[in-house]
Amino acid sequence: MKTETPSVKIVAITADEAGQRIDNFLRTQLKGVPKSMIYRILRKGEVRVNKKRIKPEYKLEAGDEVRIPPVRVAEREEEAVSPHLQKVAALADVILYEDDHILVLNKPSGTAVHGGSGLSFGVIEGLRALRPEARFLELVHRLDRDTSGVLLVAKKRSALRSLHEQLREKGMQKDYLALVRGQWQSHVKSVQAPLLKNILQSGERIVRVSQEGKPSETRFKVEERYAFATLVRCSPVTGRTHQIRVHTQYAGHPIAFDDRYGDREFDRQLTEAGTGLNRLFLHAAALKFTHPGTGEVMRIEAPMDDGLKRCLQKLRNAR
């Protein structure tokens, strides 16, 4: 292991950064530093605001000067870092839109939005490495690791607040494309089924339909039919964990290659049909929202990757 010792940093707090707690602010500034170390340097008085000691719950004000001490951060050896750097570089190729307020990318399948839980690399960590000069980069919403498509990132705290409010008030519209088993009935335009989240002993999250769960609704529209599968457009009205995956399963049409809620026989059919599919066929195709800076209504679309396109073409040819 190598260690890197950065120098003392003085940061002037902007109006956009004001209002947040100092401990949360330090977590954005000291990326990769454990929370325990952040609280230790606060407790020891190594972090100063306007040259004074402060408590972790102190709320920053515009114009505050924050002294951030040098913190030793262990880094992996170069051999271990290089695949990480390749992933960081690849993120630059999937950015769909960027301005001073937001960044939108087409997240690849298989990449987590956050590191952690045994994962060293996530989209947000990669973006921070790609944009080291950015003072603020935070996820507005999440996508499951195996789901690809539109992912929205805020570049200002004010933008994050605005976009989170849109999510709460259902002012943001998300459209997904999913390949499901069998013939989806055109009259089934909505699935309303309460969802309950459980944590298994392994730590794995599993969601099921239960009257004890939270109210959940997904709207559906048939996009294209094939011999033994249907491509459906899914628009979640609520935003529960694994919502689309569980609602399609509940409707009797699980998503292709869903290792948690899917159907192995359906996956085998797809393999034998020569589709080449080996990942969850769930793609966040479009996101509609109001721009937090300009007030303009935006709709950003993310194209499917080549693997999903090839799969659909193979199914069309087999009809």
From Swiss-Prot:
It comes from the Bacteria. The keyword Heme does not apply. Pfam families: PseudoU_synth_2 (PF00849), S4 (PF01479). GO terms for biological process: enzyme-directed rRNA pseudouridine synthesis. InterPro entries: PsdUridine_synth_cat_dom_sf (IPR020103), PsdUridine_synth_RluA-like_CS (IPR006224), PsdUridine_synth_RluC/D (IPR006225), PsdUridine_synth_RsuA/RluA (IPR006145), RluA_PseudoU_synthase (IPR050188), S4_RNA-bd (IPR002942), S4_RNA-bd_sf (IPR036986). Belongs to the pseudouridine synthase RluA family. This is Ribosomal large subunit pseudouridine synthase C. The gene is rluC.
